[in-house]
Amino acid sequence: MKKIIVGFVLMLTTITSYAQQDAQFTQYMYNTININPAYAGSRGTMSIFALHRTQWVGLDGAPVTNAASINTPINESNVGLGVSIVNDRIGPSDENNIAVDFSYSIQTSERYKLSFGLKATANLLNVDFTKLKMLNPGDYSFENNIDNKFSPNVGVGFYLHSDNTYFGLSAPHLLETTHYDRYAGTGSKSHISKENINLYFIAGHVFDLSYNVKFKPSLLTKYVAGAPLQVDLSANVMFNEKFVAGLAYRWSASMSAIVGFQATESWFIGYAYDMETTRLENYNSGSHEIILRYELFKNYNKMVSPRFF
């Protein structure tokens, strides 16, 4: 039965009419630049981020994601810049996204800034069909592997934020790119992997429950054609601006426990464990995600305390 499930997962990632989605993160709130270019430079300091995520541990061919990024404001200007790399491995596919982000911010009120962002992405897709067990060995459509198939893309984002509140709307990939069409030139719409538009909305607010305790509920919704609407709800508490603990729920998919520690003024480490709430939980032992963030507090408007997002 487990092999059947594995085959089903691999089919979802490779066969006809697959609506491709962006890599999934539970701790997205610490690296929002991956989904919204307007986030670049919004923390007021250079921020370096790394992530490793192993999804559905124990299930062959399950997603493994590695990500790294750096973003910073440019001196006293309203400009922010960022660069990010995401590697996503699922079954026979190995995909790399290299992105450059640009943001421009305007002061809309005494408390709020509105940032506009642009993203340019280079996608490199590799698919090794020899890792699949073919139902029809004579199907020559899968005879040749895909090697570093290049696809460019662009994205946009808006980010309204203050010291304790944020809202964001973004589409990191606007171009609906067909990475590989096995019937190219015949007029068929059958394809192996198609990049559909992913639309994101995020929101969050930090409540000061006491001098040493902060509470932050947050929301992420993601829409992509051909896939169910994704809704992520999370609630995190920060103690003494050092320790973070919280819970998250991905609608009809999983529940998560999140912990974090601000080791120094610059270093933050976070961990999340996801447990499936679907029948898939019978075939894996959960998902693990660890993040590491390093920040240089050498900006013109140095933050008095670590920001919660």
How does the language model describe each region?
Residues K2-F8:
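Sec-dependent signal peptide recognition
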Residues Q20-F309:
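Subset of outer-membrane beta-barrel
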Residues T14-T16:
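N-terminal signal peptide c-region/cleavage motif recognized by signal peptidases
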